[in-house]
């Protein structure tokens, strides 16, 4: 299932992801994944997740294949270099990049290509859960459509659970099964994508229509 979280800047969208990953401790309550708390084996917990970062977060000093295979080369169960490279090349192909890109460095690629590399890295270890943080920010409409299509295809193909943060309503409509509207750290509305346009929720209605008047203050 693909859940998309929408909401204005500073409403807590990225913080929500960081809380799930254990990077930020929630003020109250608890985080359950498949009905269970994080547990003591943090490495095993994090191994269930993949993440596409907003800015790509590629390592400038590593080649593209080394970026994609970064997790595969770490920890107790790290793979041999040759095996990790082969998996990286396979994932690069899956996101539409040729093998010739594998030995280049991030600075040699366009923004759209870097975003694809980030996506390849997010799926390299076959995670159960994938987080996408503003996946189309900074991309032109055509490349945004390409990334949205890839996200949708890969999530369905892998049978993964996906959670995406975005301001881009075209992305919401392209990749969401369900949507959650976050405001001031509170989920104001959640429901299937089919109910988005006629939710009856004043917060969601104001956000979708870009109106200054409504329960969301235009100046924060």
What are these model-predicted stretches?
Residues 130-133:
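Catalytic Walker B motif of ABC-type/P-loop ATPase nucleotide-binding domains
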Residues 126:
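Conserved catalytic motifs of ABC-family nucleotide-binding domains
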Residues 29-37:
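Conserved ABC transporter NBD signature motif
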Residues 81-100:
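Conserved ABC ATPase "signature" region
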Residues 21:
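Helix-to-loop junction immediately C-terminal to a conserved catalytic motif
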Residues 105-109, 113:
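Conserved ABC ATPase signature
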């Amino acid at each position: 299932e693909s859940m998309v979280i929408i909401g204005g800047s500073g409403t807590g969208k990225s913080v929500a992801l960081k809380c799930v990953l254990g990077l930020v401790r929630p003020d109250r309550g608890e985080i359950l994944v498949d009905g269970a708390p994080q547990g003591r084996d943090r490495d095993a917990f994090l191994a269930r997740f993949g993440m596409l970062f907003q800015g790509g977060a590629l390592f400038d000093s590593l080649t593209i294949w080394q970026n994609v295979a970064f997790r595969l080369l770490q920890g107790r169960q790290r793979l041999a270099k040759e095996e990790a490279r082969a998996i990286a090349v396979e994932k690069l192909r899956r996101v539409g990049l040729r093998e010739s890109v594998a030995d280049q460095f991030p600075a040699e690629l366009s923004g759209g290509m870097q975003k694809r590399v980030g996506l390849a890295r997010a799926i390299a270890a076959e995670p159960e859960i994938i987080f996408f943080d503003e996946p189309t920010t900074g991309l032109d409409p055509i490349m945004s459509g390409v990334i949205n299509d890839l996200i949708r295809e890969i999530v369905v193909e892998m049978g993964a659970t996906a959670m995406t943060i975005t301001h881009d309503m075209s992305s919401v409509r392209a990749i969401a099964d369900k949507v959650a509207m976050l405001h001031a750290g509170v989920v104001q509305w959640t429901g299937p994508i089919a109910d988005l346009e006629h939710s009856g929720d004043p917060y969601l209605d104001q956000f979708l229509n870009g109106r200054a008047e409504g329960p969301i203050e235009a100046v924060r």
